[in-house]
Amino acid sequence: MSSFIKRFRKSTLVAFNRTVHFLQDDYSVWSYEIDADKESVPFEKGRPRKYFDADSDSDEEQQNGDEPGTGKNNGGGDTGKKDQDDQTNAIVALDVNEDRSLVAVATGDKSLYLFEVDQDGRTLKVLSRRLLSRASSCVKFAAGGRFAIVCDKGGDCYKYDCEEYRKPGRWLLGHMSQVLDVLIDTEEKLIITSDRDEKIRVTCHPDCHNIETFCLGHTEFVSHLEFLGPELLLSLSGDKTLRWWNYTSGKELARKELELPGNKLALQKLAADGTGLLAVLCYKPTAVNVFKLSGTTGCEFVQALNLKSGQVFSTIAFDESGNLLGFVIEESTGAPSLAKYEFDRENFKLAKEAAFIKSFDDSKLPYVDSVSFLFKKKFDNIKDYQERKRKRIEENNKQLG
């Protein structure tokens, strides 16, 4: 089960299960629960097209329009398995675009929802619900909010129009393994994707058949990407490294060794001189390591933020004030809560210890290890083969003797 924290103007967006929560400055919360059975949801039946017909706007002629997980065309489903459906249809990917007040949410039932936040900042309006070919692994808006890119667990990336939001998606590019993160440069000329097979790929847009370069060097899955400046990219990997790249040339500029494999990172809004805080959530997420970014390709360790026994971090993010927010789960009960760590912006030190600013008492989010399966699996078939060969030779020798 996934959870997400995003900055949205003066609010903090927290999403998990099937609910999106907006936390205001005064810690008041308004929530929106995604319900596929709501009649007001504009449901689009056309699924995205792939390579051979990517220029087509719709594929409704070839699709039956069955809603995922129901086998029906009317959007209805069996309500007798609500608890199971809540888990199956939970939020699996999310992104926000402040310029156009948009929120994109992908759910486990292979749906992509596009929401608009009303001017009062307290209401979500459903613009569309579109079908995905596979379960999503990540979603990202372009800087201007004209479109969003959705990547799935099969390695394919699709482009979804946010202006003509009734259109199905169009296939852009594909990897040979699961895509874990995606970025779009501010000019919308390059798409950067990272995958489970240790690769970072820089692809031209909209001519995605042209690959600009690869950023190669990681030896495990690349879980997170962040822009640090023009042509400067930061990557986090399961090989226990942070790496800085010139993403137009594919050249590695610097690296930072970590004690544990990297899972997620959060980047504080950088100052004009490029300084700021970087928080890294590693595998076995009982602590967050905080670093100070110095210059364009360096960082120094500040401190580790540790939780009590029996608690784990699910995700992290910095708010508008530069404070670190951590979504914390009690392993024994699945009770989620939001913790805030306040930092001094001048010396980058922790100013206040963790304060749990919001508890979601009516919700449960069991902690699930979503990282261990990403590591490479090594199989030593030679020893098994040699053992079988030895036994076969011994049996043959006995028969001949």
From Swiss-Prot:
WD repeats lie at residues 86-125, 174-213, 217-255. GO terms for cellular component: cytosol; nucleus; tRNA methyltransferase complex. Residues 54-64 have a biased composition (Acidic residues). Its main location: nucleus. It comes from the Eukaryota. One of its GO terms (biological process) is tRNA (guanine-N7)-methylation. SMART domains: WD40. Pathway: tRNA modification; N(7)-methylguanine-tRNA biosynthesis. It is found in: Nucleus. Signal peptide: none annotated. The keyword tRNA processing applies. Keywords: Nucleus, Repeat, tRNA processing, WD repeat. Residues 45-85 are annotated as: Disordered. Transmembrane segments: none annotated. Required for the formation of N(7)-methylguanine at position 46 (m7G46) in tRNA. In the complex, it is required to stabilize and induce conformational changes of the catalytic subunit. PANTHER family: TRNA (GUANINE-N(7)-)-METHYLTRANSFERASE NON-CATALYTIC SUBUNIT WDR4, WD40 REPEAT PROTEIN 4. Belongs to the WD repeat TRM82 family. Forms a heterodimer with the catalytic subunit. This is tRNA (guanine-N(7)-)-methyltransferase non-catalytic subunit wuho. The lineage of its organism: Eukaryota, Metazoa, Ecdysozoa, Arthropoda, Hexapoda. The gene is wuho.
